[in-house]
Amino acid sequence: MHRIPGPIRVVLTGGIACGKTVVSDDFRALGTEVVDTDIISRELSKPGSPMLEAIAKALGAGALSEDGSLNRRAVREMAFHDKGKLGILNAITHPAIMEEAMRQAFAARGHYVIMAVPLYFEGGAGGYADRVLVADCAPEVQLARLMARDGSSEATARAMIASQASRDTRLAGADDIIDTGSLSFDEIRTAVLNLHQKYQTL
């Protein structure tokens, strides 16, 4: 397969509450451009947008908050409990989000660009990554972080984790790994700096 042109694309992914934001923020601090699909998703689903209208039509009025914005918690609950709705949601959002992500990646000026794609493996691990960086942590650390962050019960947190690709799948598909569970913030920063220097030579 021919490589898609443009800067080197490093996909940053990882399980929920595994420290992807900390890692991406450290890359940003080094001047690296970061294309974040979560941010793109929020931009594309603003009130009045075609994507938001399509989501509301497919999932019903419960997908919207009183102010007309996307009710992310409600949509997450719908998708979590109904695989059919999850498939519909992904069919509406994924192509548009990835089209914009690739547009931003092509426009990046550095030697490499970080593409933060939380559900990279769940989305079929499309052939746009030159390298895959996984933010990882031990399952017990992930569970504790998720419960603390979202105020979730243990059962809900475990179910959310189980709905994603397995840790083994992510690690098997990784070219590089940063263990955010065992490293301090300073050590994570150092690990990012080392990878930054490595990626500059690819």
Label every model-predicted segment.
Residues G15, A58, M78, I92, ...:
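Amphipathic alpha-helical segments that mediate coupling or scaffolding at interfaces
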